[in-house]
Amino acid sequence: MAEELRIMENKSREDTNLSPVSKIEIYSFFDPFSKDCFKLSAILSKLRIEYNKYIKVRHILNPSLKVLTKCQAQSTSDFDNIALAYKAAELQGRIRAERFIHLMQNEIIPKRDIITEDMISDCINNAGIDYQVFKEDLQKDKLTDSLKVDLHIAREMEIEQAPSLVFFSENVHEEGLKVEGLYPYHIYTYIINELMGQPIEKNLPPKLEYYIQKKQLVTMEELLTIYEWPEKLLNKELKKLTLQQKVEKLQYPEGEFWKSKMPQC
């Protein structure tokens, strides 16, 4: 297994003053413009489904100079700076913020679009975030302070690239396990099982239509990751949902997407 991991290091989190909140806590450092980070989000979704009782994932936009410069270059104001927008979204809850960044990545990666205020606005509303509160929060100085905290965490964990995951057990004095880059799904399940030290009963994924309804927009690759069905069978089930007017197929240069026509649950 060690040979399969190109870079896997132990890092302590004692100096970051972070408290464990679950059996296994996973810190996910991402670049919103990275295709590998986009692909990893599907793997993290599957981990959350199967190991829901055993893990908690915390997403942190990698506050490196390279990523923040890219966020600034893609923006015309604070409103469409995705780094600041993500921090403002976090003030209304991490779940909503994660939904927001998922929707944003679905916009900017497959379509290769630049970020606009309209795009931010649509994703904010679709993520269930209060738009007026979001606009007010964007003006607060504490967003910059929050980015500085993320930078401190990234430096303490010696994060040098995105995606990077750092796994921690519930013992705050134990070192974390850092995994840089993108790997097959079984690598991450191996790590979780090793850290737990006991067999884990995995949950089954929800019905296909419920998953798409919750996510609103998903890639074909994500669905193949979540369900592990033969592609022919998955296409057959998606066709059924299309005929039932529950989903619609979208085609972009980066691949095939499926959009829910059902109200968000």
UniProtKB/Swiss-Prot annotation:
Domain of life of the source: Bacteria
Protein purpose: Adapter protein required for efficient degradation of Spx by ClpXP under non-stress conditions. Interaction with Spx stabilizes Spx and exposes the C-terminus of Spx for recognition and proteolysis by ClpXP.
- Pfam families, sorted: Thioredoxin_5
* Protein family per UniProt: Belongs to the SpxH family.
Q: What is this protein called?
A: ClpXP adapter protein SpxH
Tell me which UniProt keywords the record has, alphabetically: Cytoplasm
Q: Where in the cell is it found?
A: Cytoplasm
One GO cellular component, as annotated? cytoplasm
